[in-house]
Regions:
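Amphipathic, well-ordered alpha-helical segments in soluble domains
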Residues: 22-25, 52, 83
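A short, ordered amphipathic alpha-helix with a cationic face
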Residues: 45-47, 73-74
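Catalytic alpha/beta core of large soluble enzyme barrels
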Residues: 1-35, 39, 45, 104, ...
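Internal maturation/activation junctions in enzymes
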Residues: 30-37, 55-104
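Short capping micro-motif at the N-terminus of alpha-helices
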Residues: 97, 110-111
Length: 234
């Protein structure tokens, strides 16, 4: 689901209900001819959903660790669970074993200008977003004709083209330099504990002088850390 900066708790709850309904319906599509029947049985038994938030880092409440943010997340997780149980009864299927998550959702984030997806801050106030296009796609020639900046793909120069678009982050958006590595990790932990029934995914930007503290944090929360990767800040 796409989170907008202006969304109230009621707005987000409505989006959670809609996404959960769609997920429960999708979980009924378990006719998988040609593969191991155990796979279909597992899908029918667990009916895992993936109700995820995209645009969190642009939201004034959810982009920061606070008591208010925790209250919102706990409430929204309960909304998702209640909705899944009610909708599963209507369809006559098992209630999902896990519903809520937080994944990068890069394509959705770009299509809706909802940041960089997942729990990641925007890279900077201005940055260049690149897209890879097949040269056989009519859209490729169209974008070339209208003057979109482009260059041959380094890996496949004869068959692919890379297009570049300049992006400006909205006012008030959180940038990578606005958060320390520990602040990013604590934000991830808040979503892990109070929203996600699956594990949230995140890549943490780490400055040279932060690695020791990050290592200590990861050791302290060893039993909870999963789906976390790290990149040098620069």
């Amino acid at each position: 689901m796409v989170v907008r900066a202006s969304d109230t708790l009621q707005d987000l709850a409505r989006k959670v209900r809609i996404c959960t309904d769609l997920g429960v319906f999708q979980s009924t599509l378990t006719h998988f001819p040609g593969i191991n029947p155990e796979y279909a049985h597992n899908c029918e038994e667990e009916r895992l959903l993936g109700v995820s938030m995209t645009g969190v880092m642009d939201h004034p409440v959810l982009n920061t660790v606070s008591d208010e943010a925790i209250e919102w997340l706990v409430h929204l997780r309960g909304v998702a669970r209640d909705q899944a149980e009610n909708t599963a009864k209507l369809f006559g299927v098992n209630v999902s074993a896990a519903i809520t998550c937080n994944k990068p959702s890069g394509t959705v984030a770009q299509l809706t200008n909802a940041g960089t997806g997942g729990l990641h801050p925007r890279y900077s106030k201005h940055y260049v977003r690149t897209y890879r296009q097949d040269n056989k796609d009519p859209l490729t020639q169209f974008m070339k004709d209208v003057g979109v900046r482009h260059e041959p793909s380094f890996m496949k120069p004869d068959s692919e083209t890379i297009f570049s678009f300049v992006v400006e982050s909205p006012e008030g958006a959180v940038m990578r330099h606005d958060r320390t590595a520990i602040e990013q990790l604590e934000h991830w932990l808040m979503f892990q504990r109070h929203w996600c029934e699956h594990k949230p995914s995140i890549t943490i930007y780490v400055k040279d002088n932060e690695w020791a503290e990050v290592g200590a944090w990861a050791f302290k929360h060893f039993d909870e850390v999963c789906g976390v990767s790290f990149l040098p800040f620069d």
